[in-house]
């Protein structure tokens, strides 16, 4: 994720479309502004943050907010392995391997359970402090545990429970819920594939998934898709 901007700019300058699963939520808008300029200069398309969250879940949140404009949405991830968080921990000096689990506490609040296998001679307290100060973890309750073998713990399953309670017009107590249990890398890859397809149908610039017409994610004749899905 931290290398997305650098590599995407190089590729966009060659006139080639890019899609990515950038997942540092607080930096998405600044990345979009940066890549929008590069994409337009290269006459190419960039679609960013196109995994399942951010990504397809963002589309669900947008739809729910449209049909219940007043209200609160809670996105509860997991329990499951976060690929982005796990990669971030592996990049820390002294870490041989790592697994970061996202545990839902409720109402959109999460706990991070991080399991680390250390390089020989690495100091656990130093590694723990580096993890807790990393942008991926600094805003969440984070627990770091040293284990002899991370591979013994690995499971690529993940999930999300997305709930919105709100108001449609003057009608209160509208409750919506979206729930899925998934194989994280498989779903992320599938989203990236359909977004790459959609990128071929957009004007030059940088987009997030909520800016892309959902029908553009699908292959097939537009009239047939409308007849089938509407």
Language model segments and positions:
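Rossmann-fold NAD(P) dinucleotide-binding segment
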Residues: 2-21
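General beta-strand structural signal in soluble alpha/beta enzymes
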Residues: 20, 46-50, 76, 99-100
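Rossmann-fold NAD(P)-binding glycine/threonine-rich loop
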Residues: 22-46
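Gly/Ser/Thr-rich loops at beta-strand to alpha-helix junctions
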Residues: 25-28, 49-57, 79-83, 185
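Short alpha-helices
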Residues: 43-65, 192
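C-terminal substrate-binding/catalytic lobe of Rossmann-fold NAD(P)-dependent oxidoreductases
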Residues: 80-197
């Amino acid at each position: 994720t931290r290398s997305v901007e650098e590599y995407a700019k190089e590729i966009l300058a060659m006139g080639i479309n890019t899609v990515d699963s950038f997942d540092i939520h607080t930096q998405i808008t600044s990345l979009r502004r940066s890549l929008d300029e590069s994409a337009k200069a290269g006459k190419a398309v960039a679609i960013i943050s196109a995994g399942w969250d951010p990504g397809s879940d963002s589309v669900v949140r947008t739809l729910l907010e449209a049909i219940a404009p007043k209200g609160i949405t809670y996105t509860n991830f997991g329990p499951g392995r976060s690929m982005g968080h796990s990669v971030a921990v592996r990049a820390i000096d002294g870490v041989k391997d790592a697994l970061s689990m996202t545990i839902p506490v409720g109402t959109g609040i999460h706990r991070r359970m991080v399991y680390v296998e250390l390089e020989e001679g690495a100091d656990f307290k130093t590694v723990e402090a580096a993890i807790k100060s990393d942008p991926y973890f600094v805003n969440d309750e984070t627990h770091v545990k040293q284990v002899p073998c991370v591979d013994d713990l690995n499971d690529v399953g993940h999930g999300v429970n997305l709930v919105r309670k709100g108001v449609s017009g003057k009608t209160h107590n509208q409750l919506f819920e979206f729930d899925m249990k998934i194989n994280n890398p498989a779903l992320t890859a599938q989203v990236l594939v359909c977004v790459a397809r959609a990128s071929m149908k957009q004007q030059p610039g940088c987009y997030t998934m909520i800016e892309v017409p959902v029908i553009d994610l699908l292959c097939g004749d537009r009239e047939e898709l409308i007849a089938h899905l509407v």
